[in-house]
């Protein structure tokens, strides 16, 4: 890896980074995809591989795991390098290149950098009530969906009022579970169609406006103590498992130590219409990017990736030309792939 020079280094192997790797390959750019963890897929792989994703064009619905697999198949079509277990511990400018330090020792050079690292590492916002530690140790309190092949006809409770909790509840009723949805308010801050689906399902029990005041693991069930928000009345329910759906907090401590550190707002890097950050040659896409009017969707990230790639080329090789349509790119190698041949030669 040392002394190797790439056209583009993409930091982060979530959906945005994977699609950027594929598009860069279509443009025949020498590309490195760098991922700090042992697996590709980013937040999807870590947090919701079983979740059905509805906002990706061309799919009526696709699980997080299947989407990552499809993206991996795309990247296999092009010539590029992927480095796993490789945390970018420093990024600095050297002459006309960026030096990228990996795991505090190995390094290589890139003509441009695309940050696709999302919001960094994630940890769940945990429930803090009497008995919550014991419930988590017993496995009856979790913060991620279980394997959905094993949950049919189980009784679950999900707590929270945002997209995380509502999405969890929808996945569970879609797999024939009974779900009690606990929220301290009557209204939910989530996709309206998902809330409507829960309201129309006989498998959903709304426990609102209520809050959890205690947890008590029994032999096979978890007893949840609830308190009514308006009048303080206490109620108890028993479930097979409780899932915390308060979302996750992000940490970007390693990124914050880079020598070249673009301007940030909240957890994202401020980008312009070219997806360029405050530092020329460094771009950001997906959840790592923020700009006025942005929608934090996978679909948005997929659109940002080609913009960043094409503008990166314009940065380090302005004579090479601007945006390219897929029909004008070199597909000679791509169409050697059996899966592509079978689709287009039928």
From Swiss-Prot:
Cofactor mode of binding and number, as noted: Binds 1 FAD per subunit.
InterPro entries, per database record: FAD/NAD-bd_sf, FAD/NAD-binding_dom, Fd--NADP_Rdtase_type_2, Ferredoxin-NADP_redctase_2
Keywords from the named record: FAD, Flavoprotein, NADP, Oxidoreductase
Superkingdom as given in the UniProt entry: Bacteria
Cofactors, names only: FAD
EC class of the enzyme, as a word: oxidoreductase
Keyword NADP among record annotations: yes
Annotated EC: 1.18.1.2
Gene Ontology molecular function terms on file: ferredoxin-NADP+ reductase activity; flavin adenine dinucleotide binding; NADP binding
Binding positions (FAD): 35, 43, 48, 88, 122, 287, 327
Pfam families in the cross-refs: Pyr_redox_2
Catalytic function, reaction form: 2 reduced [2Fe-2S]-[ferredoxin] + NADP(+) + H(+) = 2 oxidized [2Fe-2S]-[ferredoxin] + NADPH
Similarity comment: family membership: Belongs to the ferredoxin--NADP reductase type 2 family.
HAMAP family recorded: FENR2
Subunit structure: Homodimer.
Protein name: Ferredoxin--NADP reductase
């Amino acid at each position: 890896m040392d002394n190797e020079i790439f056209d583009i280094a993409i930091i982060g192997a979530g959906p945005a980074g994977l699609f950027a790797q594929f598009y860069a390959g279509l443009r025949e750019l020498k590309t490195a995809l760098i991922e700090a963890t042992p697996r590709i897929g980013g937040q999807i792989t870590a947090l919701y591989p079983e979740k059905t994703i509805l906002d990706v064009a061309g799919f009526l619905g696709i699980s997080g795991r299947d989407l990552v697999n499809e993206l991996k198949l795309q990247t296999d079509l092009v010539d590029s390098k992927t480095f796993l277990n490789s945390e970018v511990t420093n990024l600095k400018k050297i002459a006309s290149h960026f030096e990228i330090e990996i795991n505090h020792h190995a390094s290589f050079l890139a003509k441009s950098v695309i940050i696709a690292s999302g919001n960094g590492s994630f940890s769940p916002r945990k429930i803090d009530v009497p008995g919550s530690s014991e419930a988590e140790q017993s496995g009856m309190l979790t913060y991620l969906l279980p394997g959905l092949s094993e949950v049919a006809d189980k009784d679950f409770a999900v707590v929270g009022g945002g997209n995380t909790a509502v999405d969890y509840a929808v996945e569970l009723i879609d797999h024939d579970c009974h779900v009690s949805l606990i929220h301290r308010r009557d209204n939910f801050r989530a996709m309206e169609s998902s809330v409507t689906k829960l309201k129309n399902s006989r498998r959903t029990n709304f426990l609102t406006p209520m809050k959890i005041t205690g947890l008590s693991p029994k032999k096979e069930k978890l007893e949840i103590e609830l308190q009514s928000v308006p009048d303080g009345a206490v109620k108890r329910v028993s479930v097979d498992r409780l899932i915390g759906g308060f979302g996750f907090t992000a940490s970007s401590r390693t990124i914050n130590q880079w020598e070249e550190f673009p301007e940030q707002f909240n957890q994202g890097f401020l980008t312009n219409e070219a997806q360029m950050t405050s530092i020329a040659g460094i771009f950001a896409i997906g959840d790592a990017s923020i700009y006025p009017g942005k929608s934090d969707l996978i679909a948005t990230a997929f659109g940002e990736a080609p913009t960043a790639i094409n503008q990166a080329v314009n940065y380090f090789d302005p004579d090479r030309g601007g945006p390219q349509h897929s029909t004008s790119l070199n597909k000679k190698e791509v169409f050697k792939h059996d899966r592509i041949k079978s689709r287009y030669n039928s």
